[in-house]
UniProtKB/Swiss-Prot annotation:
InterPro entries: Aminotrans_II_pyridoxalP_BS, Aminotransferase_I/II_large, AON_synthase_class-II, AONS_Archaea/Proteobacteria, AONS_Proteobacteria, PyrdxlP-dep_Trfase, PyrdxlP-dep_Trfase_major, PyrdxlP-dep_Trfase_small. Catalyzes the decarboxylative condensation of pimeloyl-[acyl-carrier protein] and L-alanine to produce 8-amino-7-oxononanoate (AON), [acyl-carrier protein], and carbon dioxide. GO terms for biological process: biotin biosynthetic process. Pyridoxal 5'-phosphate binds at G113, F114, S181, H209, T238. Its cofactor is pyridoxal 5'-phosphate. Homodimer. The modification N6-(pyridoxal phosphate)lysine is found at K241. It comes from Aeromonas salmonicida (strain A449). Keywords: Biotin biosynthesis, Pyridoxal phosphate, Transferase. This is 8-amino-7-oxononanoate synthase. It catalyses: 6-carboxyhexanoyl-[ACP] + L-alanine + H(+) = (8S)-8-amino-7-oxononanoate + holo-[ACP] + CO2. The keyword Transferase applies. HAMAP family: BioF_aminotrans_2.
Length: 398
């Protein structure tokens, strides 16, 4: 105890006890390292099927060398917000590289995807606007949408008929994801682009989990689905998943970026990402653009895993991306299955409410190009035959 009185206006213990009783209490696990699809915890080695390091770049020697060189040149921190002295030539070069890669006019860097998403919504939407969101959008988008003065309307997951019924002309912003973080399926971007253009509303993609993995040169969901970058007004992506570093960006028109520089409080009032980090991300993009074989290997692993789980009788979501959700149903059952896998040397995280809807607790299994075929086979052996699980049918409707 730190000597402060426990009593007061906040009932913390009761809230924690309630979550623990419902098998929803979250606890952190301190790892001793995570490299190349492996994880070490308390001196024991595990196969790691929980990370978002989709291309296995988080321990790449070339990226690490770029990071170290950046530290030698620029130090360990940027030292200020980007509008003071925290914006360097290395940041500018990264923005230009991203704009060229993704086919947008300009890019703005953020410290993380959560702040990038919230910065955009808060800067753009006022009381006279409308915001349309997929029900399964990331918590950063849902949370900010609920706090804004505009009216937020949520449509059923990937339900374009429902969205079209809700739309009003020239009223605001439609937001959806490229690859949904808990289900691994993709948004229908040709149809989203059509509806946005038809209604005169802006369109934003959160492509945190598609960037680097999908499309030619890893340009993401839009490129994979043949949607022109100009059809989507705002692109958000992150560097901490397939790119193996950390940070995020927002891309679009030069006017959009200039506006965010002036009105996005998350950008204006935050210390900028370390310059050395920008150097590492720039090097990562070089590798990602040339990583066709890694993406092909990853696709083969996904196919192998899906075929193997089908043979064992497990229920997977309709995903062809590295995110493979194995539906369990009850939170306690998901925790028990995750514990069983850990006993067998495989680390997979159980995802429970409120991250996912009640009754849809799951194992969020993520594959990486760092995995080998024998790693996938070991995961399948650890899972074993299904002894009964929930069904995906009808989960996302209504």
């Amino acid at each position: 105890m730190n000597g402060l009185a426990v009593k007061g206006p906040f009932v913390l213990g009761a809230a924690l006890a309630e979550r623990e009783l419902a098998a929803l209490l979250r606890r952190r696990t301190a790892t001793d390292g995570s490299v190349g699809g492996r994880l070490q915890v308390a001196g024991r080695d595990y196969l790691n099927f929980s990370a978002n390091d989709y291309l296995g770049l988080a321990d790449h020697s070339t990226i690490k060398a770029a990071f170290k060189e950046g530290i030698d040149c620029y130090g360990t921190g940027s030292g200020a917000s980007p509008l003071v002295t925290g914006y360097s030539r290395a940041h500018q070069q990264l923005e230009e590289t991203l704009a060229d890669w993704l086919g947008v006019e300009a890019v703005l860097l953020f410290n993380c995807g959560f702040s990038a998403n919230q910065a955009v919504l808060k800067a753009l939407l006022g009381k006279d606007h409308l915001l349309w969101q997929d029900r399964l959008n990331h918590a950063s988008l849902q949370e900010m949408g609920s706090q804004l003065p505009c009216k937020m309307k949520r449509f059923g997951h990937n339900d374009m008929t429902a969205l079209e019924r809700q739309l009003e002309p020239n009223r605001g912003l439609i937001v959806s994801e490229g690859v949904f973080s808990m289900d691994g399926d993709q948004g229908p971007w040709p149809e989203l682009a059509r509806l946005a253009a038809q209604s005169g509303n802006w369109l934003m993609i959160d492509d945190a989990h598609g960037l680097g993995v999908l499309g030619p040169e890893g340009r993401g969901t839009l490129a994979a689905q043949g949607v022109a970058p100009a059809s989507v007004h705002i692109q958000m992506g992150t560097f901490g998943k397939a790119l193996g570093v950390a940070g995020a960006f927002v891309g679009g028109s030069r006017e959009l970026v200039d506006y965010l520089v002036n009105f996005a409080r998350h950008y204006v009032y935050s210390t900028h990402m370390p310059t050395a980090q920008a150097c590492a991300v720039s090097k990562s993009i070089e590798l990602v653009r040339a990583a066709d074989e890694s993406r092909a290997h990853l696709a083969r692993l996904i196919t192998r895993f899906r075929q193997g789980t089908a043979a064992l009788g497990w229920q997977l979501g309709a995903s062809d991306t590295p995110i493979q959700p194995l539906l369990v149903g009850e939170s306690s059952a998901a925790l028990q299955l995750a514990a069983r896998l850990r006993d067998r040397g495989v680390w997979v995280s159980a995802i429970r409410p409120p991250t996912v809807p009640v009754g849809t607790a799951r194992l969020r299994i993520t594959l990486s190009a760092a995995h080998r075929e024998q790693d996938v086979d070991r995961l399948l052996k650890a899972l074993g035959p299904c002894s009964g699980s929930a069904s995906w049918e009808g989960i996302h409707h209504g």
